[in-house]
């Protein structure tokens, strides 16, 4: 049973301002990784980050994963696309092992129903999964799954390696290409009264240029 799970791509993006002013930018520590700018800004709430890390640590021997949802947006000032990940849906009924994760037909039905019933106004932004003891990269199977089930240019993937506490995002280039070895950081949406909580050892905070942005989430 196969279900195409990227069904909301025809929906127009939310027109709003990107929330740079409440975000902490995280970039790879590897200088070579930083040579290419992020193709599309990805903002992530602290709650979403914590939930994915908790799921990643729930099974250190086998791959686990799920969906990421939130809002697909277009900056009302600059016209550039960006996404805000604020909802995490851990996958159920998967087939998994130390080096593989399969979203079965039952997985896709359960996740899709959960998204529609509980978060009808949210967009399916992509998926996340772990690579226990293997590092942060995209395998051939990961690439096939991403291209076939998350084909929209604004849909992204997150890979977490829980043993080393490292992770990174895989984001398509404007021409649609996807480098299986090059990952990107993200913008952590922070609480005004506290700092960042990202603890991955392969990312570091970056100073952010004045990006002249205002409010976003409540649009």
Model-based region annotation:
Residues 1-124, 133-219:
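Conserved beta-strand-loop surface patch within small alpha/beta domains used
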């Amino acid at each position: 049973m196969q279900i195409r799970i990227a069904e909301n791509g025809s929906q127009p993006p939310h027109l709003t301002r990107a929330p740079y002013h409440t975000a902490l930018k995280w970039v790879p520590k590897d200088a070579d990784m930083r040579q290419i700018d992020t193709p599309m800004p990805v903002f992530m709430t602290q709650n979403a980050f914590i939930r994915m890390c908790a799921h990643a640590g729930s099974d250190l021997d086998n791959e686990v994963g799920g969906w990421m949802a939130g809002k697909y947006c277009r900056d009302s000032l600059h016209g550039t696309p960006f996404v805000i990940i604020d909802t995490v849906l851990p996958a159920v009924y998967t087939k998994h092992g130390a080096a593989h994760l399969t979203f079965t037909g039952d997985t896709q039905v359960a996740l899709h129903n959960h998204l529609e019933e509980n978060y009808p106004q949210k967009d399916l932004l992509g998926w996340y999964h772990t690579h226990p003891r293997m590092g942060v990269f995209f395998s051939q199977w990961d690439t096939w799954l991403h291209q076939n089930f998350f084909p929209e240019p604004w849909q992204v993937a997150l890979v977490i390696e829980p043993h080393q506490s490292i992770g990174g995002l895989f984001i398509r280039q404007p021409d649609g290409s996807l480098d299986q070895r090059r990952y990107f950081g993200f913008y952590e949406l922070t609480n005004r009264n506290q700092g960042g909580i990202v603890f991955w050892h392969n990312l570091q905070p970056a100073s952010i240029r004045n990006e002249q942005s205002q409010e976003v989430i409540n649009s």
